[in-house]
A protein has these predicted regions:
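C-terminal ends and interior cores of transmembrane alpha-helices
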Residues: 21-68
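Small-residue-rich segments within alpha-helical transmembrane domains of MFS-like 12-TM solute carriers
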Residues: 68, 72, 84-92, 123, ...
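Cytoplasmic helix-loop-helix junction between adjacent transmembrane helices
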Residues: 73-117
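Symmetry-related core transmembrane helices of the 12-TM Major Facilitator Superfamily/SLC fold
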Residues: 142-162
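Extracytoplasmic gate region of multi-pass secondary transporters
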Residues: 194-222
């Protein structure tokens, strides 16, 4: 919701770079959490002594942390949370950018190609992560995460390139970057009262409920 508000308020260019930066920050935290440099640091001591009990969440059995959980896992979870916020922001931003660039053209083909390339990115992660982890004969997970950080750095650079390309497009067409009306709290009521919104939301819930658990546990199946 907040990503949509930022996108409507600030436009595609700003939100694209913001989402890329957020993803890179989250992934960098994730990488540092699994490196040897994190072991014995002050951050490790802090995570060992904190976040062992979260009132309310523990009673419901849905706490992301627990007593005895490794500090590296806690810090990596924080980084992954930040990364996930950037991912969702990037998802809607890319869709908005495609609508702008391919309006009146092969928009459906462009969106389909974008989704196909995104799935190839997931496949790349699955295929090459074990390869990087086993480089040199010594298994080190941090190398796989570092590979992801490098890819995200490249992605951020591409977002910056897109920023200038989109700005050049506006200059050529004589149009300003399209921004929606300022966000109002009443807009949430209109969205939540729409049956179409709930239908699409339910489809997304069902889809991701099937895909993400499978991705997580498929490794153990193999």
């Amino acid at each position: 919701i907040f990503a949509g508000i930022i996108l409507d308020k600030m436009g595609v260019r700003f939100t694209a770079i913001l989402s890329g930066a957020v993803m890179l920050i989250g992934a960098t935290i994730n990488w540092y959490a699994v490196t040897e440099a994190f072991m014995g640091s002050g951050l490790e001591a802090w995570f060992n002594n904190n976040l062992n009990y979260i009132p309310g969440f523990d009673e419901l059995g849905i706490s992301p942390f627990y007593l005895g959980m490794p500090a590296s896992a806690k810090f990596a979870a924080v980084g992954f949370m930040i990364f996930g916020c950037g991912v969702e922001m990037a998802g809607i931003t890319v869709s908005r950018g495609i609508v702008k660039w391919f309006k009146g053209r092969e928009m459906a083909l462009a969106m389909g190609s974008e989704m196909a390339l995104a799935r190839l990115g997931v496949a790349t992660c699955m295929i090459f992560s074990p390869v990087f982890a086993r480089l040199g004969g010594v298994i080190d997970v941090s190398r796989s995460v570092a590979f992801g950080v490098v890819l995200l750095l490249i992605a951020l650079i591409m977002f910056i390139v897109y920023f200038f390309m989109d700005k050049k497009l506006d200059a050529q067409t004589g149009e300003a970057e399209e921004k929606d009306d300022p966000f109002k709290i009443s807009d949430l009521g209109k969205i939540l009262s729409s049956s179409g919104f709930w239908l699409v939301a339910l489809l997304c819930v069902l889809y991701y409920s099937a895909i993400f658990p499978f991705q997580k546990y498929a490794v153990n199946m193999l």
